[in-house]
């Protein structure tokens, strides 16, 4: 007997299917389901009178043969596709993406459900990989709470707390600080990795930081990013298979952007805030987007360009870089970094895939909880101002969505050598997953999973008779408590440090994971974000020309994903 359902009725019961479209929050962005792994009439759903019951959708298989958790009928949005599927999680990892059910009585089942299987209802929800923020100033540990609640599950950067050096630079300097920060990482339900200070002209001060556990090194102009320091730092990185991140020389004291590029010598490097408002050769650091060995990212205060962007940056910059507004030279330094023309061009370079990643610059000219929001606000602004991208059309923005989601998931993972563990929703990877109601997509996740266990969720009054009564707000769940914390989150270190046994020497509880393949990455590896234009910046007008085209756009006067969703 066959029952025909309308698309609306089907979507309300099992979530959208192939050809259905979903609006992302209150933006103008629409995604369309490209494939449905489930089978019509054989869908599984949990609840009273539903399918996942003993002898029906639940089989008799033992724990070894079934997942620990399934997310049913979810819409997956990832760099590789936009699909509807059931997601299986086993031993903290994504085990399969496919069709769940009871293979004894149902056709086409690729994921067997058993008595050992927990169910998370994904009907009508969007699932993305946990975000990766690669520009963290570890100024206050409370940043981690904000980041996790926003959908970020991995934080990479440097610092030691609210020290003056950390307020300005993302460096955890020296073996002693590195050991202490790695020990502190055991207390937080998020994946962490730390960058050492890369500013030295001889290798040993850098090698000892890698040996102590640094996943890479950070070159910052406030410590002196000279060509000699750049060359030495990259040489150490090549020898240790670690990444280098750089904040270049805003004042052009030791050379211009061409001098910095020459010091790279074709070696891989991650350029932070590549537009320059966050720091870097004024006014033309954007030129490095055309280099094959440069992996460029933005920080979120300039994302997207709005009528308020310029006004907030001056005071923000003065505080972050320990400048004095009463000193003319300090004021000139600050003003040289804030250029409306290059900020406007930054929007377009993101939309065209020339800027590959987006990060926060947390508490140091950036907002740790707004990486994901500002990524999608930029995508919306570009859709409104520039129309559909090639490959998209009137029906959907699938390619644009894949391009933008890659900026804070897979591309940062590839850049920093952790893509074998995190950064996408693929079998074998750590199950760091974020569930969103479409109306709140990118803004307020419903639930965040770490290593296959619920870490943070929107939860109502714990004394209520059901989970939903007010006040509903983000609360930490069982993955953040006791021994579960150390078994659901990762600490990334260098291979050198892992081989030297720092986990035992430091007494670390979390699983440590060595970074790898950091030195053979090129711009071509930046998924959906590999464009290498030839860029010039007029030194007087700051006009940005990319492959002969003037890049300019108007500032936004209103944005989605903003006051509609927040009381304050």
Swiss-Prot record:
Belongs to the metallo-dependent hydrolases superfamily. Urease alpha subunit family. The keyword Thylakoid does not apply. Substrate binds at residue 220. The gene is ureC. This is Urease subunit alpha. NCBIfam families: PRK13206.1 (NF009685), PRK13207.1 (NF009686), urease_alph (TIGR01792). Ni(2+) 1 binds at residues 135, 137, 218, 361. One of its GO terms (molecular function) is nickel cation binding. Carboxylation allows a single lysine to coordinate two nickel ions. The active site is at residue 321. InterPro entries: Amidohydro-rel, Metal-dep_hydrolase_composite, Metal_Hydrolase, Urease_alpha_N_dom, Urease_alpha_subunit, Urease_AS, Urease_asu, Urease_asu_c. Its cofactor is Ni cation. Heterotrimer of UreA (gamma), UreB (beta) and UreC (alpha) subunits. Three heterotrimers associate to form the active enzyme. One of its GO terms (cellular component) is cytoplasm. Residues 130-568 form the Urease domain. Binds 2 nickel ions per subunit. Pathway: Nitrogen metabolism; urea degradation; CO(2) and NH(3) from urea (urease route): step 1/1. Its main location: cytoplasm. Ni(2+) 2 binds at residues 218, 247, 273. It is found in: Cytoplasm. Its EC number is 3.5.1.5. SUPFAM superfamilies: Composite domain of metallo-dependent hydrolases, Metallo-dependent hydrolases. It comes from Burkholderia ambifaria (strain MC40-6). Disulfide bonds: none annotated. Keywords: Cytoplasm, Hydrolase, Metal-binding, Nickel. It catalyses: urea + 2 H2O + H(+) = hydrogencarbonate + 2 NH4(+). One of its GO terms (biological process) is urea catabolic process.
């Amino acid at each position: 007997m066959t029952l025909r359902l309308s698309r609306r009725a089907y979507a309300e019961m099992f979530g959208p299917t192939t050809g259905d479209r979903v609006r992302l929050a209150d933006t103008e962005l629409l995604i369309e389901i490209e494939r449905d792994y489930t089978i019509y009439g054989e869908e599984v759903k949990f609840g009273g009178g539903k399918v996942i019951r003993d002898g029906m959708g639940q089989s008799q298989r033992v724990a070894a043969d079934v997942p620990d958790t399934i997310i049913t009928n979810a819409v997956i949005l990832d760099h590789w596709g936009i699909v509807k599927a059931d997601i299986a999680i086993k031993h903290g990892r994504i085990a399969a993406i496919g069709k769940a059910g009871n293979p004894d009585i149902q056709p086409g089942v690729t994921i067997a459900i058993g008595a050992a299987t927990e169910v998370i209802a994904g009907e009508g929800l969007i699932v993305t990989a946990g975000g990766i923020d690669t520009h963290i100033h570890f100024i206050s540990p409370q940043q981690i709470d904000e980041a996790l609640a926003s959908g970020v599950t991995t934080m990479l950067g440097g610092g030691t707390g609210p020290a003056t050096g950390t307020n300005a630079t993302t460096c955890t300097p020296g073996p002693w600080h590195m050991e202490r920060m790695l020990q502190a990482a055991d207390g937080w339900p998020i994946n962490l990795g730390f960058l050492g200070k890369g500013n030295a002209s001889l290798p040993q001060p850098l090698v000892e930081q890698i040996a102590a556990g640094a996943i890479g090194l950070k070159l910052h102009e406030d410590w002196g990013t000279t060509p000699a320091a750049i060359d030495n730092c990259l040489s150490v990185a090549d020898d240790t298979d670690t990444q280098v991140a750089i904040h270049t020389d805003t004042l052009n004291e030791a050379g211009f952007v061409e001098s910095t590029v020459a010091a790279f010598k074709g070696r891989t490097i991650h350029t932070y805030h590549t537009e320059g408002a966050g720091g870097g050769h004024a006014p033309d650091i954007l030129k490095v987007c055309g280099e094959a060995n440069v992996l460029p990212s933005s920080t979120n205060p300039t994302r997207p360009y709005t009528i308020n962007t310029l006004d907030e940056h001056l005071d923000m910059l003065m505080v972050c870089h320990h400048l004095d507004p009463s000193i003319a030279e300090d004021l000139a330094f600050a003003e040289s970094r804030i250029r409306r023309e290059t900020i406007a061009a930054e929007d377009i370079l993101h939309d065209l895939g020339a800027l590959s990643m987006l990060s926060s610059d947390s508490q140091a000219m950036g907002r740790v909880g707004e990486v994901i929001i500002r990524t999608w606000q930029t995508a919306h602004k570009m859709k409104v101002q520039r129309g559909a991208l090639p490959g998209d059309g009137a029906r959907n923005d699938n390619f644009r969505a894949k391009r933008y989601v890659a900026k804070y998931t897979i591309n940062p993972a590839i850049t920093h050598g952790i893509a074998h563990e995190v950064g996408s929703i693929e079998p074998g990877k750590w199950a760091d997953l974020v569930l969103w109601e479409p109306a709140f997509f990118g803004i307020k996740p419903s639930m965040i999973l770490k290593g296959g266990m619920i870490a943070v969720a929107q939860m109502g009054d714990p004394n209520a008779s059901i989970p939903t009564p007010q006040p509903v707000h983000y609360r930490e769940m069982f993955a953040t408590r006791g021994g579960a914390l150390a078994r659901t989150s990762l600490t990334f270190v260098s291979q050198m440090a892992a081989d030297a046994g720092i986990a035992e020497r430091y007494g670390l509880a979390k699983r440590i994971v060595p970074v790898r393949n950091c030195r053979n990455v090129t711009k071509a590896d930046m998924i959906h974000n590999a464009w290498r234009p030839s860029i010039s910046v007029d030194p007087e007008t700051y006009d940005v020309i990319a492959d002969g085209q003037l890049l300019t756009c108007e500032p936004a006067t209103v944005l989605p994903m903003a006051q509609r969703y927040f009381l304050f």
